[in-house]
Structures are given as C-alpha cells and as structure tokens.
Amino acid sequence: MTKEDSFEMHGTVLDTLPNTMFRVKLENGHVIVAHISGKIRKNYIRILTGDKVTVELTPYDLSKGRIIFRSR
C-alpha cells in the first residue's frame, strides 16, 4: 500500500485502550480505534484523553487508523 492510498482526518481521543490503542472521535462524528505510529512511539510522545490528533486511514478498513500527529 502506498502513501497515496491513505488519507488523513482530525479527531479527539475519547479513551485509552490496552496495547497503545485509542478510541478516537473524528470530525465527521465517526468513532474509530487507532494505534500510534512508530515515530510517536520511538520519541515517547504521550497521548492522553482529550488530545487533538491527526489520524491516517486506509480506504480498506475505515474503522481502524494510525495516529500520526498530536496537536498541542
């Protein structure tokens, strides 16, 4: 899968799940489950409930995503 196949959306973290998974509510109202990307994990960036995040989704499964950026 190439980077062009995925698209980004903004959302808010609703709650934290085990294994660095998060429930995220997107701007369009959908609720998805997202994990954190490797760069966020490597740099020990903490993601808490209520944080604004950017999520990368694939067209194959719109219920799962990857958190690629945490807004301040």
From Swiss-Prot:
GO terms for cellular component: cytosol. One of its GO terms (molecular function) is rRNA binding. Keywords: Cytoplasm, Initiation factor, Protein biosynthesis, RNA-binding, rRNA-binding. Pfam families: eIF-1a. InterPro entries: NA-bd_OB-fold (IPR012340), RNA-binding_domain_S1_IF1 (IPR006196), S1_domain (IPR003029), TIF_IF1 (IPR004368). SUPFAM superfamilies: Nucleic acid-binding proteins (SSF50249). It is found in: Cytoplasm. Its main location: cytoplasm. Residues 1-72 form the S1-like domain. It comes from the Bacteria. The keyword Cytoplasm applies. Belongs to the IF-1 family. Component of the 30S ribosomal translation pre-initiation complex which assembles on the 30S ribosome in the order IF-2 and IF-3, IF-1 and N-formylmethionyl-tRNA(fMet); mRNA recruitment can occur at any time during PIC assembly. One of the essential components for the initiation of protein synthesis. Stabilizes the binding of IF-2 and IF-3 on the 30S subunit to which N-formylmethionyl-tRNA(fMet) subsequently binds. Helps modulate mRNA selection, yielding the 30S pre-initiation complex (PIC). Upon addition of the 50S ribosomal subunit IF-1, IF-2 and IF-3 are released leaving the mature 70S translation initiation complex. This is Translation initiation factor IF-1. It comes from Blochmanniella pennsylvanica (strain BPEN). The lineage of its organism: Bacteria, Pseudomonadati, Pseudomonadota, Gammaproteobacteria, Enterobacterales. The gene is infA.
